[in-house]
Amino acid sequence: MANSDQNRDVFPDDVSIDDDTSVISTRGLEAFGRKVTTTASHLIGPITDPTSHPHYQTAMTEIHKQLQKPTLQRGVFAIARTTPTDLVRSKLSSKEIQSRALAYVPDELLRNIPASSNSYSLFQGFQASFPDFTDDGKKHKRRVSRGRKMLDESPVQPGSPHAVQRLKKDKASMMHQLEMLGVRKNMASSEIREIDNKIANLHGMRKIILDRLANLEKEEAVLEHDIMDVESRLDEAQELADEAESLAMATPNKSEEDLSRTEEGFMSQSIYEKLPAANTPPGKKKPRNHRKKTLPILHEHFEPGTMIRSMRAHQDNITALDFDAPFGLMVSAAMDDSVRVWDLNAGRCIGTLEGHTASVRTLQIEDNFLATGSMDATIKLWDLSKAHYDPQGSQEVDEEDEDLAFVNPNDHAVDPPAGSMADCPLFTLEAHLDEITALHFRGDVLVSGSADKTLRQWDLTKGRCVQTLDVMWAAAQATAMGSSDGPWRQTSRSADGSADFVGALQVFESALACGTADGMVRLWDLRSGQVHRSLVGHTGPVTCLQFDDVHLVTGSLDRSIRIWDLRTGSIFDAYAYDHPITSMMFDTRRIVCAAGEDVVKVYDKVEGRHWDCGAGITEAEKAKSPAIVERVRIRDGYMVEGRQDGVVGVWTC
């Protein structure tokens, strides 16, 4: 052992390693190897070494005997040849190895865990996720619970140690419950914040998709316009080809001898037949009906009451307006004697319709056909599909000069290109003796009402009046027959004479509904020209009406809206506003009306709810007062309203 101490002292490499040196270096490995070699040589040295202790020699002799056995030597050699992986597999099962591989997380990942500001631990959250077990829920432990309850009901002295221990236990239990309630409250708050973040992200995604849908509908409108253009040119080419073919078949080839013997004029009879006759009615050849191939759906995804667009259409009070479909064509008329056609998809004016010599009081657009009734006692028919209009025209010209889209309603309306509507007029209907106050057409039948106290039925195919209905005569006939309707009634609200004699009408096949200044609604049969029912209820002139298969809705200057049952002739529902009703229309869900305010009055028939929609609500926040709404139209939740200052607003409803 002394020799070992001497050898240990003579190693020059056995020195302390500085802090700056590497932990694993060449010098350290060499020193460690020499130490291991020296220690092993001393342990397994000659047994006959006189310097070693006798007990040590005896122990080493036994070890040598054991190591010389072949079985032990083969085992040692087998372990030496075994890799560490095989050694681990021999000690652990496959499930244990898989579990350790999945549960092990490297330190690099643990360093990136963000610091949580939550004061509750993961285990507390796990405890809080379990519901509380009440006595009613522990049916499988009924005996144990009863047993504990019986023990707890044993009398206990208030000052005894058992009572103090029980109170401490109850306090600890309640504190634990309070802590769990705090954890659950924090979890609920975190879930609410997470849901709010998801909702905000969904709103952002919804806005992006809405913009994409708007662009798709714009491209769709442009493509549909191009298709209609091609179809029109195709129809014209086909007509020319048919005329040329029929002319070639009707004109046989003749020789010079046959031509010299012909006693006819220089034109054949077939050519004369092709020439238009002088008395041919203007409506003989009705143009083709161009129907929309697609329907816009963008407005269906907006919240009700959202403003889509606002335009200054005119410089004066709007007297009439109508549109064919959402984001389609709109026609507006005003006291400035102008009639303008608009593209609602782009907010641009297509052109101005010229022909009337006075203001247009009423109009209707249906499938690109427009009928206008004016104070000059004439009715004009127009084909809007013949308008020269390019939906992408504003993209190729200077916006400061040629752009006709009005984002700001205070801007002045820009005149559209001249001659864009030159091919639109079809023909004029002239028979009334006074201004046209109401009209409605469906198919080839048009009915108009005038201040001359008559209703006229027109055949649009022949372009002439086929029947005249005298309202005063019908009222007199009802009086002579002793009808309960009574004679013509002069209502108190029409004493000033400002109300139209024929305020509104609608036709469907042979049925006609007409509202007049005496507050009565008369239902006519156009086949007989007689009134078969009169609806009495309004106390003021009827200004608007509309009916469907079951109900008829009327609006009057007596400030009321009445819904009639056409099957019984009785009032189904009625409600009133603060001002007279000047315009009304309904769709499948809503009844909208202009009632002398800066908003449109909306009645939801499904929910039975009244609400307001219009600039009066949005501008009130800016301390502004918009003009009064005079006219309103609605189709499929897409509403257009015209005001006294010439501004037109487009809304979702």
Swiss-Prot record:
Q: Alphabetically, which GO biological process terms does the record hold?
A: mitochondrial fission; peroxisome fission
Spans annotated as Disordered:
246-265
Keywords assigned by UniProt, alphabetized: Coiled coil, Membrane, Mitochondrion, Mitochondrion outer membrane, Repeat, WD repeat
Protein name as annotated: Mitochondrial division protein 1
UniProt lists compositionally biased (Basic and acidic residues) regions at: 254-264
Q: Where in the cell is it found?
A: Mitochondrion outer membrane
CDD domains under this entry? Mdv1_N (cd22881), WD40 (cd00200)
- Name a single GO cellular component: mitochondrial outer membrane
Record family assignment: Belongs to the WD repeat MDV1/CAF4 family.
* Gene that this sequence comes from: mdv1
Q: Which residues form a coiled coil?
A: 207-251
Q: Does the keyword Transmembrane apply?
A: no
Q: Where are this protein's WD repeats?
A: 313-354, 355-392, 431-470, 491-534, 537-576, 578-613, 618-653
Q: Where is it mainly found?
A: mitochondrion
Its biological purpose: Involved in mitochondrial fission. Acts as an adapter protein required to form mitochondrial fission complexes. Formation of these complexes is required to promote constriction and fission of the mitochondrial compartment at a late step in mitochondrial division.
Q: Which Gene3D superfamilies match?
A: 6.10.280.220, YVTN repeat-like/Quinoprotein amine dehydrogenase
State whether keyword Repeat applies.
yes
